[in-house]
Structures are given as structure tokens and as C-alpha cells.
């Protein structure tokens, strides 16, 4: 990675105190060096895409915002080769416990690891962001411009022109084929594009207090549903604890930040408030907003620039990383000429609906934890008492069965397009944002396969299909006998994975040409004891052993035995071994594939195991 004042390789150099204007050419310009912008830059960097990251601050933000990292986000860190560097700064299996009147009435503690990582993890965000930033040092074709403010930008039919100025008044003009606005909730890019950012702002604020030398020491995160002043107590890595207290009417940040008032806040939580080692405190407001579109021609929005949500489920950070995972490989294909830019339309199709669901999830968690009215508090308390007599309801809650998992019904998935229900009940549910109960019902109805989902939206013939969902990541054995996670075994690329049969048998020359253009691979999964037998494995097929029988169990639950995987590890399609060629052709259409010759395919090859997102 080039330093802030140095353009990408081959584009000339500039002294940090140079006073003459300069120009930089790139494939993609990213505005904002937060976690989403940095992750996209790493994904594109691994694909050889020329990237410029522009950040108005002179350094990466060093104070923590997010504290929760889920399994999907860790899988994306894995895909860019940075998961192992991040792990020392995480606490796996970080449960969330709700308490009322001193009693824990629910503990969210999912114990599955279907995507290869623990589902809930605490982490230190500034250290994660630094890992992403240092990860860019691997790429001579990625440059960063810290301390540069974007003054204006304009797009035309062939690209985007960006004018940025540093603290010395030196202007830099960037010309890029595409631009990504990852510049936060108050996004200059989104506001300049005049993209509506609809939603609501909670009336109450919260003060966040981070302390060193954890004065409590107990693990996990506790949400104390105290009617007088709800508060959060979260254990974080490296002896850090976070407290969050609701700001009551009439209180101000200035007053609460005084040492004596912070001591008063923590007095009921710690033994000695005078011995607390404070790091920092900040007051923030909960917002729930969603951009109407994520793409405007050659400019795309990601992360908080596209959606912001309350913190209660820790999904703001994770949703942004999902954006990066979805967008990165698509941008790489388009700028390399492998696909037409119609592929970028699928970014909004696939990500916006799930971002909306995560906003609803976060709001519902907030409704349970901190109702904004006396009536809401009473309803919450009655709901909690139901847990004692309805264990199935409690299990539904504590196992996070309510969490909407990404499911793409349109975009780069081989599913029949169908109209959604527009009946009276569906329209009523669409107005769920007008009350806590409505939001809860609306959230539960978003799972189409659930009873409530069927009542609201009608029977979903595709509810049980894995197509459009993230694929599992079990441990597998590779040819040298080592055991690795699935994504590390097959590389960061498209993959055709079959169970027990050669995925290339009967493949037409046209299908092979398409798959070669995509840089895809072929994978044969076997029961682990059979891995030593190679006579049934062609040279161009990767054989893997199913160490824990998870692949066998997965295929046993579906009617087809061949799965087409995208670089972000979502299932693009499924078929029988005799229909692979047809599925490949259909996938090429959904990808808006433009590569037509072997020569072009050579330039479009996707990186192996250390490479792109979620492979």
C-alpha cells in the first residue's frame, strides 16, 4: 500500500508538502477509510484492481464504536487473509444476557458454527480497522489519501471525477471507473447524490463509557432492563469494559461527562467508582435509516452511508462487512471486463432487503431492552414472564431463531422470479415501524418459512431451498492430509461442488469456457476415508474429505447433489450432475457475463485461497 501522499504504482509520485495539483487514475475510488471502505479495498486489492481510498481524517479512527462481530463477518476477514491477525483481539462465544430486577430472563448464546466461526464474538474495533488498513500494504496498486477532504465529484458515461484537498490546500484530482461512498451515516456522497435516507431517530440518547482494568471482570454482555435507567455492561478483550447508560430527559453530554457525574452513573454497578480507569465517553443517538437505492450509475453506497441501525444486536458493523463482501467481487468482475455493469444492479437487489431486516431486528431488541413508555415497559415485563411458562418461546429467543439470515430471492441466484404478496395483511405488516408490537410481528413474518411468514406472504415454494443462502463452511481434509476450513481449501472464486461424483462429467465445451472465464474451480467432496483413492478424480478437480460428515448431512437434506457457489460463498444454484451445463449457462446470464474468448478469460482469473471474499 502506498502512503497517504503517494499515488499508486505507475501513476507518478507526489511529495507530502507538494503545492502543485496532481492527478491519479484508478479503477475504483473509495470515499471513507472506515471498516467497510477498507474491507472493499482489501477485496479489490487481492483481485489486482487499482484502488484509491480517500479519507478526510488524518488517521484511522482510534476509538471503539462497534463491539460485536458475527460469524459471517469473520468469514469475510478469513477471505482476505486477515482472520488470524484479528483473532487475538476477539472473545468468541460472547453471549448477550437480558436481566430484569436482578434476574437473567434470557441469554442469547447460539452455539452453532455452520459458517466456520463462532456466531457471536466481542472485539476491539480500532484494532480490527488497523488490521484492515495494514492489510493494504500487500498491494502496490492500492493507495490511500488520508487527510483529504472530497470537495466535489461528478460522473459521466465512462467514469467518476473526484476533487479532493489536503490540509495544505493541495488539490488532487482522481479519475476512476467507479466510486464507492463508504463515508458514514452523514455521507457526503449520499447527500450529494440526493438519495433519500428514510427512517427514524430514537428520542433518547445514550452515553458510552469505556474503561480499562475491568472493574467487574465477569464475561459476556449484560443488558439490564432497569425501568429507572436501562444500562449495558459488556466485557471486551484486553481488560476493557463498556458501560452504556440511557440519557434521561434534561441531562446533557457536558454534564454527564464530568467526573463526579460519571462516578454517579457507575456507582450502582461497581464496588468503588473512584477507582475506575476511564478511557473515554461519548453520547450518541440511535438511528434507523435506509437509503432508497445503493447504486446511482457509477457510484455505489456501502455501510453506514447506505444504512444505519441501533446498536442492540451489534449488526451495524456486520451489515457493512456484508455489503463489502457482496460488492467487492462484482466490482472486480466489472472493472476487468468479465461482466457488464448490469451486474452491479444486483448489489441493491441483494443487500437492501437484508439491511432492512437487520434494522428491524435491532429496533425490536431495543424495544425489549429499553421501551420508551410506561405502557411499553409493562408489556415487555409481561412478555418476559411468558418465558417461564412457554419454554418454546424462550428457546426461539435465546437461540436467535428470529435473526433474519441473508436470503437472496433476486440477483445472481438461479431462482424463479415471483411476485410478492400485496394482500391486506402484508400491507399492514409493511407499516410495522409504527410501534414496538408491529415491529416484532413484522420481523417474525420476514422468515417466509415460518408460520407467521406463510400467513402474511402465502406459501413459499422456495422457502426450503439453499439457493440464495450462505453455504456452510465445515472442516475438510485436502490432498496433503491437512485439515482446513472449506473456503481455504477451494480458494476465493466461483466453485462447482459435488458430492461423491465428478462435477465435470458431461460438461459441454461452452460450459467449460464460461467457467474458465469466471476463473471457477471444480470440487469433489468425498467421505474422508475415500480421499486417498484418486482414480475417480480428474486432474482439474479438487478433492476434499468430509472430516465431520457435515457436507454429507447437508447434501442429505436437499434433493440435488451439485451446488454452484459464488465468490462470497452464497449458493447461486443447485442441480443434478446431468444438468450442470445448463445451470452454468443460466448463471452466466444472471452475471451479465461479457467474456467471450479464452484470451479475455485469462485476464479475469480470480485469486486462489488467499484471495477474494468468502472463498
From Swiss-Prot:
Cofactor(s), by name: FAD
Species annotation: Burkholderia vietnamiensis (strain G4 / LMG 22486)
Family affiliation: Belongs to the PheA/TfdB FAD monooxygenase family.
Record EC number: 1.14.13.127
Protein's UniProt name: 3-(3-hydroxy-phenyl)propionate/3-hydroxycinnamic acid hydroxylase 1
InterPro entries in the record: 3-HPP/3HCI_hydroxylase (IPR023786), FAD-bd (IPR002938), FAD/NAD-bd_sf (IPR036188), PheA/TfdB_FAD_monoxygenase (IPR050631)
An annotated Gene Ontology molecular function: FAD binding
Highest taxon, organism lineage: Bacteria
Function comment: Catalyzes the insertion of one atom of molecular oxygen into position 2 of the phenyl ring of 3-(3-hydroxyphenyl)propionate (3-HPP) and hydroxycinnamic acid (3HCI).
Class of the enzyme per the UniProt entry, highest EC level: oxidoreductase
Gene3D superfamilies hit by this protein: 3.30.70.2450, FAD/NAD(P)-binding domain
List of residues binding FAD: 27-56, 294-304
Region Disordered: start-end pairs: 1-20
Amino acid at each position: 500500500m502506498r502512503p497517504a501522499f503517494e499515488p499508486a504504482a505507475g501513476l507518478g509520485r507526489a511529495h507530502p508538502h507538494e503545492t502543485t495539483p496532481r492527478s491519479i487514475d484508478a479503477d475504483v475510488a473509495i470515499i471513507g477509510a472506515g471498516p467497510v471502505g477498507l474491507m472493499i479495498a482489501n477485496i479489490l486489492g487481492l483481485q489486482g484492481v487499482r484502488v484509491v481510498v480517500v479519507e478526510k481524517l488524518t488517521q484511522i479512527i482510534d476509538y471503539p464504536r462497534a463491539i460485536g462481530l458475527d460469524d459471517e463477518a469473520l468469514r469475510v476477514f478469513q477471505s482476505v487473509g486477515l482472520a488470524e491477525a484479528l483473532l487475538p483481539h476477539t472473545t468468541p462465544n460472547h453471549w448477550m444476557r437480558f436481566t430484569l430486577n436482578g434476574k437473567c430472563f434470557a441469554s442469547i448464546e447460539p452455539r452453532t458454527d455452520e459458517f466456520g466461526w463462532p456466531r457471536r464474538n466481542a472485539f476491539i474495533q480500532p484494532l480490527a480497522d488497523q488490521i484492515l488498513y495494514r492489510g493494504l500494504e500487500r498491494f502496490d496498486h492500492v493507495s490511500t489519501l488520508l487527510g483529504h477532504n472530497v470537495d466535489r465529484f461528478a460522473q459521466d458515461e465512462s467514469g467518476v471525477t473526484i476533487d479532493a484537498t489536503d490540509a495544505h490546500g493541495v488539490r488532487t484530482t482522481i479519475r476512476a471507473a467507479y466510486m464507492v461512498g463508504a463515508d458514514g451515516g452523514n455521507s457526503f456522497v449520499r447527500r450529494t447524490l440526493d438519495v433519500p435516507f428514510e427512517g427514524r431517530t430514537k428520542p433518547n440518547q445514550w452515553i458510552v463509557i469505556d474503561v480499562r482494568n475491568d472493574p467487574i471482570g465477569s464475561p459476556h454482555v449484560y443488558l439490564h432492563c432497569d425501568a429507572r435507567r436501562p444500562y449495558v455492561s459488556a466485557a471486551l478483550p484486553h481488560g476493557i469494559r463498556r458501560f452504556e447508560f440511557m440519557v434521561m430527559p434534561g441531562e446533557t453530554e457536558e454534564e454527564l461527562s464530568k467526573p463526579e457525574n460519571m462516578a454517579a452513573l457507575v456507582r450502582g454497578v461497581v464496588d468503588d467508582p473512584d477507582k475506575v480507569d476511564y478511557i473515554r465517553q461519548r453520547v450518541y443517538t440511535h438511528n434507523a435509516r435506509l437509503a432508497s437505492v445503493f447504486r446511482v450509475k457509477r457510484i455505489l453506497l456501502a455501510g453506514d452511508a447506505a444504512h444505519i441501525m441501533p446498536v442492540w444486536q451489534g449488526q451495524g458493523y456486520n451489515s457493512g462487512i456484508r455489503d463489502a463482501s457482496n460488492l467487492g467481487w462484482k466490482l472486480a468482475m466489472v472493472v476487468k471486463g468479465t461482466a457488464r455493469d448490469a451486474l452491479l444492479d444486483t448489489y441493491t437487489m441483494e443487500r437492501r432487503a437484508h439491511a432492512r431486516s437487520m434494522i428491524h431486528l435491532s429496533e425490536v431488541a431495543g424495544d425489549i431492552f429499553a421501551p420508551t413508555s410506561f405502557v411499553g415497559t409493562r408489556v415487555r415485563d409481561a412478555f418476559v414472564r411468558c418465558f417461564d411458562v412457554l419454554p418454546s418461546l424462550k428457546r426461539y429467543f435465546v437461540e436467535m431463531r428470529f435473526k433474519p439470515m441473508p436470503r437472496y430471492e433476486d440477483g445472481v441466484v438461479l431462482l424463479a422470479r415471483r411476485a410478492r404478496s400485496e394482500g391486506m395483511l402484508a400491507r399492514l405488516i409493511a407499516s410495522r415501524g409504527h410501534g414496538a408490537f408491529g415491529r416484532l410481528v413484522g420481523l417474525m413474518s420476514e422468515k417466509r418459512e415460518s408460520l407467521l411468514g406463510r400467513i402474511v406472504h402465502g406459501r413459499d415454494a422456495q422457502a426450503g431451498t439453499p439457493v440464495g443462502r450462505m453455504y456452510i463452511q465445515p472442516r475438510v481434509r485436502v490432498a496433503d492430509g491437512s485439515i482446513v476450513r472449506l473456503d481455504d481449501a477451494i480458494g476465493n472464486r466461483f466453485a462447482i461442488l459435488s458430492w461423491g461424483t465428478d462435477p465435470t462429467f458431461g460438461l459441454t465445451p461452452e460450459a467449460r469456457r464460461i467457467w474458465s472465464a469466471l476463473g471457477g474451480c471444480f470440487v469433489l467432496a468425498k467421505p474422508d476415508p475415500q480421499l486417498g483413492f484418486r482414480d475417480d478424480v480428474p486432474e482439474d478437480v479438487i478433492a476434499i474429505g468430509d472430516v465431520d460428515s457435515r457436507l454429507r448431512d447437508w447434501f442429505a437434506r436437499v434433493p440435488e447433489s451439485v451446488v454452484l457457489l459464488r465468490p462470497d460463498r452464497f449458493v447461486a444454484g443447485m442441480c443434478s450432475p446431468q444438468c450442470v451445463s445448463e445451470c452454468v449457462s443460466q448463471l452466466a446470464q444472471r452475471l451479465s457475463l461479457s467474456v467471450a474468448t479464452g484470451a479475455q478469460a485469462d485476464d479475469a482469473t480470480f485469486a486462489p485461497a488467499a484471495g477474494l471474499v468468502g472463498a
